[in-house]
Amino acid sequence: MTDRLSQLIQAVEEADSSKLLLEAVQNLAAARLEGAIPILIEALSYNNPGAAVASVDGLILLGSAAVPPLLELLDMHNYTARAWAIRALAGIGDPRGLVTLLGVATADFAMSVRRAAVKGLGTMKWHWFPDELREIAQEEALDALLFVAQQDEEWVVRYASVVGLQSLAIAIAEAHPTWLAEIQTQFNLMSCNDEVLAIRGRVCVAQQKLQQKIQQLKSDSFHKSIEIKETEEKKSPLTSNDWQDILNQLYEIKRQERINSGSEGDPRRFQQLAAAITETNN
């Protein structure tokens, strides 16, 4: 542990007022030191919302290194800390948080947590996914976001679904035009039928952004720049075991869907995916 990190942690531990605690956590978060992750996660449990917000911001800055301990925190019974952890996972966009965000976005009782998860589904780091797994993951995200847009009673969560759908639409526009059309149809319905003016306005912005994306896809120069960008971005810190875990979680979702719908599905699809992922990572 460096002297600087030790001093920053000591300031958090010795803070004797809400104000000093907030300042200490903010300073620790701003340092962007991986050694601070355990203390930042501990701060999510403090009875200090400002410190929790600062911790979430710091964990997001630290990115994927913070994901394993955040996922461990989800197994604990402190709902307040769990809610803040979900906000951090949503902001990081690491694929290991995907299945958690899918469940939270559609079922958590706290609207602020659902809202964070919904936005996180749209901004997932899709370029990290192996080609064999990206399609099924994006399909699950699309289903969850459409469900929220159509069913959630809280307008702030539906508003977030527009943001999430916009981000997802931009990510899948070229590879999945059918899905893009589904999103555009949902936007058209919301722009006409949603009773909240703010949502209709945000839908209008999303439609404009999508139109710009569609125009860009028609540009040869844009295609070349995207190819370069994807080559640079596709490096992922996840291991083959991480991807296998994600695949297993998605398979379980599909299995439950088959049980509920009475459909047999095709488990061979997942067997082929598992084989492809193993081969890709060897």
Curated annotation (Swiss-Prot):
This is Phycocyanobilin lyase subunit beta. Its EC number is 4.-.-.-. CpcE and CpcF associate to form a lyase. InterPro entries: ARM-like, ARM-type_fold. The keyword Chaperone does not apply. It is an enzyme of class 4 (lyase). Required for the chromophorylation of the CpcA gene product. Belongs to the CpcE/RpcE/PecE family. The gene is cpcF1. PANTHER family: DEOXYHYPUSINE HYDROXYLASE, PBS LYASE HEAT-LIKE PROTEIN. Keywords: Antenna complex, Lyase, Phycobilisome. One of its GO terms (cellular component) is phycobilisome. Pfam families: HEAT_2. The keyword Disulfide bond does not apply.
